[in-house]
């Protein structure tokens, strides 16, 4: 009992991004033998940055929830809204212990994978690690895993996933940030990589979302906070009018005039984005130099993989464009699902904001405005159809009518669920261990090849 309580305490710490990244910063600064004052300042500023970011996200989500409610009421559509938090909260009642163990040892496995393979990425988005650990734990348990085998296999799968997806996104992160210092850690990566790839195909000659040639009297629109406020104001007002005065005032505004409420919520949305951007800037100023010390000691040349808002400051206009076009993709996907007589996946405003905004930034980096729009639209379609394919897997293990919202959960869930149908627990463990061994072998061969080339180069120089 004491061990389980201790483990839950540790997991409660690790799944809070601010504390997790603060600990990494602390270890890194101590490893660099920084002065006590620098260690305290760097650690607290890193934690502060994440708390500011989290506060901005809370403000933003609080303004988006009424928008989703207005949409559902206005168009009277019934279906499933994918939600990570909802399905995890249900699963934890039965699978809490296995989730905690897989998360704790999965983070250790991530460091081991980064240390001994070429996937040099440390995934620092604690809550997404927690959600993925939960999904892996549930699927493996139902597949017949238990005890040490469950924790070992689940942790190794989680560690590999935590290193693989940041590696997949890194080529686009270099385009976005202009450096190779930070990586991307959010389990919607396939949608963002798809957006970046589409941008590279269709965005030739398209100007960046951040390049706006406006008349002098409209120059104020270059301020992203103003342009976001005005754009969202139009959307909120349309939704409020469509939902009706009585519904909005009774359900959301507490009697406040529904149009005034819509305008305030639109500006609150912009305030949430502004706070997130400030938090990200604070984090980046502290975590990159601090992580250098951490990686030098434990995992040479590793990069910190951070949550999706880390890319927002690089293209604030793409954030809004990405959200709008991802949501549009969700609406088109909803229509197509209806025509195909499949389960209706309603476009959740919150997942479409965070994943759509990120897809917009990735698409803009490779294809400008056109890339941001088409790439984010494709992301919207992806996160509409993947949950439909994941539903049978989750339904078979007792989670009907609920599903995960982000792309990587869908792909990993579908893959694991189908492996569990056709392979024994022993075979799945063997497959995962073989994959890890293959990655280690590739790393060793690459190092040997590099060492041989250096020896030959030095020999040639001496001659």
How should these model regions be labeled?
Residues 2-56, 101, 105, 109-311, ...:
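Signature of multi-pass transmembrane helix bundles
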Residues 57, 73-75, 97-101, 188-192, ...:
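Short, charged low-complexity intrinsically disordered segments located at boundaries
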Residues 115-119, 308-388, 392:
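Hydrophobic alpha-helical bundle architecture
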């Amino acid at each position: 009992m004491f061990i389980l309580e201790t483990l839950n305490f540790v997991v409660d710490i690790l799944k809070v991004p601010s504390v997790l990244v603060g600990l990494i910063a602390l270890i890194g600064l101590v490893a660099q033998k920084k002065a006590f004052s620098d260690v305290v300042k760097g650690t607290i500023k890193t934690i502060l940055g994440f708390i500011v970011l989290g506060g901005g996200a809370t403000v933003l989500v609080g303004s988006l929830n009424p928008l989703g409610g207005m949409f559902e009421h206005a168009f009277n559509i019934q279906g499933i809204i994918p939600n990570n938090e909802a399905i995890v909260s249900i699963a934890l009642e039965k699978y809490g212990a296995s989730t905690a163990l897989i998360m704790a040892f999965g983070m250790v496995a991530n460091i081991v994978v980064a240390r001994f393979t070429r996937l040099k990425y440390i995934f620092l988005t604690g809550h997404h690690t927690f959600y993925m650990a939960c999904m892996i734990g549930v699927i493996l348990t139902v597949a017949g895993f238990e005890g040490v085998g469950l924790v070992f296999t689940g942790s190794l799968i989680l560690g590999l996933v935590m290193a693989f997806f940041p590696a997949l996104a890194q080529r686009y992160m270099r385009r976005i940030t202009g450096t190779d210092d930070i990586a991307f850690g959010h389990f919607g990566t396939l949608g963002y990589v798809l957006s970046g790839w589409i941008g590279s195909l269709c965005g030739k000659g398209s100007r960046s979302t951040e390049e706006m040639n406006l008349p002098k009297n409209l120059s104020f629109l270059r301020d992203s906070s103003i342009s976001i406020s005005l754009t969202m104001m139009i959307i909120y007002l349309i939704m409020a009018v469509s939902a009706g005065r009585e519904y909005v005032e009774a359900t959301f505004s507490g009697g406040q005039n529904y149009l005034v409420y819509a305008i305030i919520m639109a500006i609150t949305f912009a305030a949430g984005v502004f706070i997130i951007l400030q938090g990200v800037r604070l984090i980046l100023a502290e975590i990159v130099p601090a992580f250098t010390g951490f990686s030098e000691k434990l995992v040479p040349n590793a990069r910190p993989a951070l949550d999706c808002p880390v890319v927002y400051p690089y293209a604030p206009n793409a954030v809004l464009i990405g959200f709008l076009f991802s949501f549009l993709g969700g609406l088109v996907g909803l229509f197509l699902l209806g025509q195909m007589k499949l389960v209706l996946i309603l476009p959740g405003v919150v997942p479409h904001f965070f994943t759509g905004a990120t897809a917009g930034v990735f698409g803009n980096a490779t294809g400008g405005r056109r890339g941001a729009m088409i790439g984010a639209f494709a992301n919207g379609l992806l996160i509409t159809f993947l949950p439909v394919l994941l539903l049978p897997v989750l339904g078979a293990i007792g989670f009907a009518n609920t599903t995960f919202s982000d792309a990587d959960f869908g792909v990993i869930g579908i893959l694991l669920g189908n492996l569990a149908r056709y392979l024994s627990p022993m075979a799945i463990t063997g497959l995962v261990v073989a994959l890890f061994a293959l990655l280690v072998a590739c790393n060793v061969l690459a190092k040997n090849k590099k060492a041989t080339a250096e020896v030959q180069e030095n020999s040639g120089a001496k001659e």
